[in-house]
Regions:
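Predominant activation on well-ordered alpha-helical scaffold segments within soluble catalytic domains
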Residues: 10-13, 45-49
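Catalytic strand-loop segment that frames the active site of acyl-thioester-processing enzymes
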Residues: 1-39, 56, 127-128
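Intrinsically disordered, low-complexity segments enriched in polar/charged residues with Gly/Pro
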Residues: 8, 23, 58-64, 79-80, ...
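Hydrophobic beta-strand-centered segment that forms part of the acyl-chain substrate-binding groove
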Residues: 32-39, 46-87
Length: 128
């Protein structure tokens, strides 16, 4: 599990120029629809890169690249202070252009919540 703190959200806001109050203004957000600030959906999605190597082991490669994503959904917001983790399922593996393409469905779970924060099919390519 990893905690999403306000400094991470603020850093993402700076990096992406998305300073919407639901993300960066704890005082205003306290009376908003979520009762606190929330992580950007794309911040949650970006953390898939942290979770993926924890979920699948890829050996004997010289390089791995992100090829894309399919079916990205954000069913539930991640409130600042919440803890999240990734769960993965390999959907497919196929040979492509001298390497392998692997599709993994990642579900970003929120501790003590029924609905996930994000569900995405990540597409990675690995080369020997």
């Amino acid at each position: 599990w990893m905690e999403i703190d306000q400094s991470r959200v603020d850093g993402f806001a700076e990096a992406t120029d998305d300073h919407q109050w639901i993300h960066v203004d704890p005082e205003k957000a306290a009376s908003g629809p979520f009762g606190t600030t929330i992580a950007h959906g794309y911040l949650t999605l970006s953390l898939v890169n942290k979770f993926l190597p924890q979920l699948i082991a890829v050996t004997e490669i010289s390089m791995g690249v992100n090829y894309g994503c399919d079916r990205v959904r954000f069913p539930s917001p991640v409130k600042v202070g919440a803890r999240i983790r990734g769960r993965g399922e390999v959907i497919s593996v196929e040979e492509v252009n001298g390497g392998q393409q692997v599709v993994v469905r990642i579900t970003v779970e929120i501790e003590n919540e029924n609905r996930p924060a994000c569900v995405v099919d990540t597409i990675s390519r690995f080369y020997p």
